[in-house]
C-alpha cells in the first residue's frame, strides 16, 4: 500500500491540517489491519500528531485496539488507553477508555486491576461501554438515576434569567423552532443540576421532546444525573405495531439517534421523519406489512413513520437472528455492507467472534458510532418504558435469544 509508506514517514508537524491527516492515517491503518498487517497499521498511527482532542482520542483508541486485539501487546495497549483517559472529558470517552484498560489488564493477567477498571467504567450507566463493562463483571441491573431536586436558590436563579423568560414566551407563541436554539445555548451554560432539571421541566411542560433531549444531553455531558431528561419518552406517538415489529424501546432508541425526535426531518439522502426512512424502503415495508402507503405521511404523520420503522427493524431483526449490532449497522449503512463486514470480521452471532470487536472493526466512523449509540439508547429505553432494570446488552450484542417483538 504506497500511501502507507508516505504516512509512516511523514511528521504531522509538517502538514497544514494535522487533524485531516490524522483521519487519513486511521483510514489507512484500518485498511492495513484488514489486509492482515497489524504492525504496519500500528506504525502508521504511532506517528500521528493531531491537534484536536477528538482526533487524539480516536488515534490512541485505534492504536490501543490494534496493539491489544491484533498484536497481543497488552502493555502497549494499556499505555494508549491511559492516554485517552487523561484526555477524556465526557462519560462516553471515559467509560470507553476504562473498558479497554480493563481488557488490556486482563490480557496482562492482572485480573484485580482489570475489575477495578470495569467497575469505574460501569458507573457510566448511560454509555455503551459503561453498559458493556457492567455486563462483563456480572452486574445485571441498569439503574436509572433519579433527577436531582432543585433548591430554592436554583428556582430563584432560574426564574430570574432573561433567557428563560424568552423561551417561555416563544413556547406560549407556539414557536418551538425558535425556542430550541435558546434552550440549547442555556443548557450548555447551566452549572447547577437543579437548574438543568428546571429547564427540562419547562420543555416538558410544552411537550417539546426535541428540546428536552438537548437539555438532557448537555446535562449528562456536564456530569449531572439527568438520565430521564436525556432519554425523553414523549417523542414517539402511540402507534399500532404490525406483527413482527421490533420492540418499542428500539423505536425510541433509533428515533433519538436518527432525528432527535424531529418528525419533519429530511436528510440530504431524502430519509424522512422520526426514524429517517427512505421512501423506497418505507414503501416496500408497507407492502410487506399490508399497510397502505403515502410518502407524504412519512413527515406529516409521526405514528405512521414509527409504525413502518418498527416493521422494517423487525424485518432486519429476523434477518440477523436478533443480533442488534447487525440490525443497527444494516439500518444505518445497508444490509450489503453488513454482508461485507461479516466476510471480513466474522459473524458476531457466532461464539468465535467477539461482538464488541466486531463493532470496533466497522470501517465507517459514522456507523460505528451509530451502532454504539443506539445500543446504549435501547438499554435505557427498556427501563424508561417498561420499568425493567435488567441489563440485556450481552444478549443484544450477539448470541441468539428469545422473542423481542413489540409488546414483549
Predicted regions and their residues:
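Helix-turn-helix repeat elements of alpha-solenoid scaffolds
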Residues: 1-7, 31-43, 68-82, 137-144, ...
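Long, internal scaffold/assembly segments composed of regular secondary structure
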Residues: 6-7, 16, 170, 187
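Catalytic glycan-binding domains that act on GlcNAc-containing polysaccharides
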Residues: 12-21, 26-28, 35-63, 72-76, ...
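C-terminal, active-site-flanking charged/polar segments
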Residues: 122-140
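Terminal intrinsically disordered/low-complexity segments used for targeting and assembly
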Residues: 137-149, 400, 404
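Acidic, serine/threonine-rich low-complexity intrinsically disordered linkers/hinges in large eukaryotic
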Residues: 145-175, 392
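Long hydrophobic segments that form regular secondary structure
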Residues: 165-193
